Structure formats: C-alpha cells, structure tokens
Amino acid sequence: MIKNQSQAGRYGDFGGQYVPETLMTELQRLDRAFQHYRQDAHFQEELTDLLNNYANRPSLLYHAQRLSDQLGGAQIYFKREDLNHTGAHKINNVLGQALLAKKMGKKRLIAETGAGQHGVATATIAALFGMECDVFMGKKDTNRQALNVYRMQLLGAKVHPVTTGSMVLKDAINAALQEWTRRCDDTAYIMGSATGPHPFPMMVHEFQSVISVEARQQILDQTGHLPDAVVACVGGGSNAIGSFAAFLDDTSVELIGCEAAGKGVQTPLTAATIERGRTGIFHGMKSLFLQDKAGQIAPVYSISAGLDYPGVGPEHAYLAASGRAQYVGINDDQAVQAFELIAKVEGVICAIESAHAVAYVQQLAPTMRRDQTIICTLSGRGDKDVAAIAKYRGVTIDD
C-alpha cells in the first residue's frame, strides 16, 4: 500500500506534515536523503550487513506446536523479534534511521521511548556508531521500566524523565520534538513508531518491513502456502506495519492489529485508538486520536507502557478505513493471561505488548481449521515486564 502514498506523505486522508516552519526544512532534507539512500546499493548492503551480523537477523519463524494443539484449530507461528539484539523489533528501524543520520553528517541521536525498548535500541546504535544519545521518557514509564532506564544509561545515553502532561509516551514525543526543533543542525530524531510527520511513517514502514519480508518467505518454505492471518500488537504501530507490509497485496491474508483496551474499550482507561478515536492532528500528523469532548487529546491507559499512546500511525488509520486490516481491543486481563500461557506452554516470556497479539490468537485459532495458519509477531521479550506482571498478580519479588 506504500505505493498509494502521495509525495506529501498521505495515506488516503491521513498523514502529512503539520509542524512548525523551523522543522519543515529539516523534514524536507530528511525526505530527500531517505529517497536517495533507499535507492543506493551501498547503503542497502551496509544496512543488510548490520541487520544480519549485528542485529541477529533473520529472526526465526517458530511453529508453536504445543500452543496450536492446546487451542485447537489453526497452526500458530511466532515471528520471533524478541530474539533480535536488544530484545525487540525496534533495532530494525533504529539501524536504518541511524545509518541514514550518519550519512547526513549528524553527530547526535535523540529518541522518545515508552516501554524503553526503542530507547535501548537507539542507545545501542549510538554506542556502535560513536554518537551522542539523549532519550526522553515519561516519568511514569521510567518508574515502571526502571531496568530499561539503567540499560540506556549503561549504553552511554542520557535519559530525560518527562514530568509534563500524563508523563507517558505522548509526553515523551512532545519533549523529543521540542528538543529536535531547538537543535536539528547536528541532531537526528529517531522516531520509534510509525507515527509523526512525513517522512517518518514511510521510513518506519520501510525499515520494519524486513519482518514480513522474511516471514512471508519463511512461511512459504515451511508450509508451502501463505498464512491465513497475520496478527500483531498496535500502539503507534511500528511492529504491526512491519508485520503487515509484505502481505498488503496478498488479499487472501487477513491482517489484524491488537490495540490495548486497558480496563475496557468502553471505559476511560483505554488506549484503543482505532475503535474509539476520532480524526485529528497531533505530533505532526493527521490520524485517529483519542480525544475528549473538547477535542483535546485524552489521557490513555494500558498495563503496557509501549501501547498507551493516544493515537495511531496514519497508515494504520488508512488500512482500517479502507478495510484492508481490522483492529481489535485486548484488555489488561487478557494480555496478562496470554503472557502467562505462552510462558507455560511454549517456554517463551514475551513482552506484555506482544501478549496483546497472543491473546487475540487465543480467540482466533479455535475458530479456524487445523490446516490453516496464523503468523503472530512477538515484538519483544518480556524481561522488562516480569516485575510488573508479578505486581499485577499480587506477587512480591524481593530485591
């Protein structure tokens, strides 16, 4: 569907560039560089080498046989992005954007982060490339993801707790955009999700598409046919757009994004943007956002720090509006139960974000035939979430 995007960075009615004039020139410079280097054979060779020999690609497509048997119905295959270096899909995009920044002569990387995985990936590649790194993270998220805060600091990054607004991911993005506006001459903003002004959604789509390019070939090699469904969690939407990208033109493949319903889609404590959101402009893009009656961005909630974003990337808004993909809400209880299930049945402790996708697979698989297949992306590993899940279950873990 990327070919349907206009030069202005539009996905149907969504996307675009809604930024201060001070950033417009830098965005245009970034777009020109991206369009040049995406066609540059040497750049692609360098990126592929880093993905394969540093980030540990290709990631496995693993047949979850015991889970498939227990649920009955479809055969379930996990795309194991949790096995990448740094433990999540985030490094795919960071390598691409940071390599581009290096080619542009930038000396410093900045990023926002929610669960901390994008911050860790950015700090990791900044260390690899010998660049400065500053990461902005909501104060609430620094508290619930303290391990990742220390990992970023260990990697040489400065972590800036954001104490404005709700002190979560949207506020971290605000702070990062403000910092980029202040200092864009030597600084590259590494956008972590498929959000923001053009060309960020297009760049994230391209650099994360390696997930589905690999998965498509792997499922053909293992089963001889395309999957019947691809399932991935959605906050801003980077791992989901990467999981969907190579299947967009395969109309027989159902694409399903799983949003964080929090305490319930119909409650105020939710982050189910596509189901509950309205069209608006925020963070430099036109997309769907959770808003209050006055049209202001509403507070959101999820047990997952990586999914509690009040909007969604413009390509996801377009895919939902066009009917090419469907989006469902998964509440905290369902996600935690799925987190525990695959740990016990498959020996995999996945990120709580990914567990939202697993929870929907639990519902979907039994409705399908045994000769049908589902690919479910495990976007990250769950080390960072174990303490929070224990607390959720009332279990005390001693220091």
Swiss-Prot record:
Pfam family, one: PALP
Reactions catalysed: (1S,2R)-1-C-(indol-3-yl)glycerol 3-phosphate + L-serine = D-glyceraldehyde 3-phosphate + L-tryptophan + H2O
Cofactor: pyridoxal 5'-phosphate
One GO CC annotation: cytoplasm
UniProt KW keywords: Amino-acid biosynthesis, Aromatic amino acid biosynthesis, Lyase, Pyridoxal phosphate, Tryptophan biosynthesis
Enzyme class (EC, first level): lyase
UniProt cross-references to NCBIfam families, sorted A to Z: trpB
Protein's name in the database: Tryptophan synthase beta chain
Species for this entry: Lactiplantibacillus plantarum (strain ATCC BAA-793 / NCIMB 8826 / WCFS1) (Lactobacillus plantarum)
